[in-house]
A protein has these predicted regions:
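Conserved acidic residues
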Residues: 31, 101, 300
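N-terminal, positively charged/glycine-rich alpha-helical extensions of SAM-dependent methyltransferases
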Residues: 1-3
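Conserved class I S-adenosyl-L-methionine
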Residues: 30-37
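Signature of N6-adenine DNA methyltransferases within the class I
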Residues: 6-7, 12-20, 24, 37-45, ...
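Non-catalytic DNA-recognition/assembly elements of restriction-modification systems
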Residues: 104, 226-284, 380-448
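Proline-centric
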Residues: 21-23, 27, 110, 144-148, ...
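Polybasic, glycine- and aromatic-enriched phosphate-binding surface used to engage nucleic acids
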Residues: 244-386
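Conserved residues in the N-terminal Rossmann fold of short-chain dehydrogenase/reductase
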Residues: 79
């Protein structure tokens, strides 16, 4: 039943992906393999089809286990709640004398709440899960640590946002400091009924110093290697760089400039006004307001809170107007500083950084919340400050999306690159990257 599975966070992996993962892992002959949330058993069958004999599985769903047993023809599969039971009890129920070499699978991912619970008296375990993000897949990872041998490998399909969402930071930091991330494969929105993107993360139970994480993409039914990043580079959030150029640009921007959150003197956050006249996200367009003239004085920038890669930042100077909760507000010193910030925000450089390194290259609709905007590299450059302010004022006065408007936007991009000392090769690369994802309506070269 689709609604039952969705409510329980159950998304079965098809044979194609499970077989590809088994092949990718290059599991040695004779290794002991366990899928502790095996569902109907596609990982089990894939492992057996690859010649592995020591394959074990368990799941809380008796009907799924019955189907798994019929499909696989093996007896090492049992009905068991592997989130509620600890590792020793799970191994004993499966008649395994010691932890296994490989823990694989696609554990359920759904937030723990009054309807979704883990039935265990182990308060320390529940406390760790709660402090690490309070989701069933978090519990599954902690249990996997108990099920894998000291040099064992854990390979799970989990939500991509595990890599950067703040609530998961405790477990992320533990993995970075005490385990070894062998690889991360970005498979995008693989399960169409899931709200979000997924990754395949493969860990070694022990920590190996001076290790590089292999990062892969997924396309044409293949895992495509992108690059390797030292695990020591990360201390909390894990960014999936697409190539060496992205990695190089990120390191330079991070090391050379302060962040917007460190430089902004005022409020950065959601609008709070309940007034019927408050500006909403839909009232904003790039550099102007749809139903009102742009104010001349004030200290506020209004940004549509909904962000899409196709459009990028949509924001306007808003003077002293009030904003609803569908708007992100930045307040700073005066109208000139606000217009300078506005120019930076609309640049391709800013949107490139936001998409790639704040949203971790997500293709889904995101939000321009303060926690993301504050990460943007920011410099008040005396050489280009007045140029950017002048171009923004010109854009406010020019007919929206006219040829003159687009020409001014291109001039703005050039000046922002100058502001950040981005050379021609890197600016050309960033332009090309953004034109791949942005809608053609925002590309002046396509408009001409």
């Amino acid at each position: 039943d689709a609604s039952y599975k969705k409510g329980k966070g159950i998304y079965y992996t098809d044979m194609e992906l499970s077989s590809r993962i088994i092949k990718f892992l290059e599991i040695p002959c004779g290794a002991y393999i366990l899928d502790p949330c095996c569902g109907t058993g596609n990982f089990i069958v894939s492992a057996r089809n690859s010649g592995h004999e020591n394959v074990y599985g368990s799941d809380i769903d008796a009907n799924a286990i019955a189907l798994c047993q019929r499909k696989s023809g093996i007896k090492n599969i049992t009905v068991l709640d592997t989130l509620a039971n600890n590792g020793k009890d799970i191994l004993r129920e499966l008649h395994l004398k010691s932890p296994v070499d490989y823990v694989i699978g696609n554990p359920p991912y759904v937030p723990i709440n009054k309807d979704i619970t883990i039935d265990t008296p182990d308060r320390l375990f529940l406390k760790s899960v709660k402090e690490s993000g309070s989701n069933l897949f978090i519990a599954a990872i902690y249990r996997a640590f108990e099920l894998a041998c000291p040099d064992g490998v854990i390979s799970y399909i989990i939500p991509k946002n595990f890599l950067h969402v703040a609530s998961y930071s405790k477990l992320r930091k533990l993995i970075l400091s005490e385990k070894t991330i062998l690889s991360i494969i970005d498979i995008g929105v693989y399960f169409k009924s899931v709200r979000g993107e997924q990754i395949i993360i493969t860990l070694k139970s022990s920590h190996v110093p001076n290790h590089n994480i292999r990062i892969y993409g997924y396309g044409d039914n293949e895992f495509i290697k992108r690059l390797e990043v030292p695990q020591s580079f990360y201390d909390n959030e894990i960014l999936l760089f697409e190539n060496e150029t992205d990695f190089r640009i990120y390191k330079r921007l991070e090391s050379s400039y302060k962040k917007l959150g460190d430089s902004c003197t005022g409020y950065v956050g959601r609008g709070k006004s309940k007034s019927p006249s408050a500006v909403t996200g839909k009232d904003i367009r790039k550099f102007s307001l749809k139903n009102a003239p742009v104010p001349q004085k004030g200290d506020r920038v209004f940004i549509q809170n909904i962000y899409s890669a196709e459009a990028g930042i949509i924001a306007s100077f808003a003077g002293n107007l009030e904003a609803s909760e569908t708007v992100t507000v930045i307040t700073d010193r005066d109208e000139n500083m606000c217009r300078y910030i506005l120019g930076i925000l609309h640049s391709r450089l800013c949107n490139y950084f936001l998409l790639k390194f704040c949203y971790n290259n997500s293709k889904l609709t995101m939000h321009t919340d303060a926690k993301y905007l504050k990460k943007l590299p920011f410099i008040i450059n005396s050489r280009t400050f007045n140029k950017i302010v002048s171009i923004v004022k010109l854009l406010e006065q020019t007919r929206y999306m006219s040829n003159e408007w687009f020409e001014a936007v291109e001039s703005l991009n050039d000046v922002v690159y100058e502001t950040y000392d981005i050379g021609r090769a890197e600016s050309g690369y960033i332009d090309a990257q953004m034109r791949e994802v942005q809608s053609g309506k925002w590309d002046y070269n396509r408009q001409k």
